Amino acid sequence: EICACLVGSEMCIRDSSYGMNPLFALPLYKAGMDPDSVLFFRYLFAIPLLGIMIKARGRSFKIQRKETFPLIIMGLLVALSSLTLFLSYNYMAAGIASTLLFVYPIMVALIMAMVFKEKLALQTIVCMLLALGGIGLLYKSEDGSTLSLIGTLLVFASSLSYAIYIVGINQTSLKNVATLKVTFYVLLFGLSLFVARLLYSGVLNTPDQWYLWANLLALAVFPTAISFLCTTQAVQYIGSTPTAILGALEPVTAVFFGVTIFGESLTPRLCCGIVLII
């Protein structure tokens, strides 16, 4: 019971914190920053925070050779998921993008069933069908217009990357590695993707106001360090599929901030779609 309460609390914290992505990212976009620059600073600031936590707990940074490759792959998957999600904000409302992202539990369940032969429960299948129905409602608005195809594909790419990460944490040697250490190296290796893209483009946008730096720090703390820590620990405790399915608060948080702060519309059709998905 204690373990169940702990995991439940961690999932609430994870969902609430990860749903804050639009809250801190959109003001940075408005100030002229691009997704690569935002994510570079997001990961860069999160890494030392986790390093301090590891040191404060007296843990070692040492990893075994067999853990290096899985950590690199997991890092690149998380970075790719972040990049495609943040790119999608340029094509659709952040609340809708974050809601569409919640198809990743379906992908996790399918991967576990098809690759690792995990039996799909009837309730899981029903949940998957309801989520697909919700996506259908979101894809076409009440005025007949459809969501951006590019934006939708970007969100689905983000969902797939995140789903593979959640499965990978539980199906590799990383399952028995300390959560803090896994998260630290995942973000460290993930940072390399944004470094490479920035070196290729030759452009790194930096904030020109103190409160924008505060936004970057908040991005590093809440939807990055805290969220990924809780996700990794939950996967190690209860497995990939339950962790994914228990993430219902994530899109709710994103939609709440999108509507209340950024003036995104909340129609009956959108509400029905969100309810079906979560």
Spans of features found by a protein language model:
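Juxtamembrane helix-loop-helix junctions in multi-pass membrane proteins
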Residues: 16-45, 164-189
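Hydrophobic alpha-helical transmembrane segments of multi-pass membrane transport proteins
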Residues: 16-20, 24, 53, 72-91, ...
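Membrane-interface interhelical linkers
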Residues: 9-10, 16, 47-73, 114-125, ...
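Single conserved hydrophobic/aromatic residue that forms the stacking wall/gate
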Residues: 1-8, 13
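Specific alpha-helical transmembrane segments that line the substrate/conduction pathway
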Residues: 37-48, 77-78, 86-119, 124, ...
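Helix-capping/transition residues at the boundaries of transmembrane alpha-helices
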Residues: 29-30, 89-90, 116, 173-174, ...
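Hydrophobic transmembrane alpha-helices of multi-pass small-molecule transport proteins
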Residues: 50, 72, 111, 120-140, ...
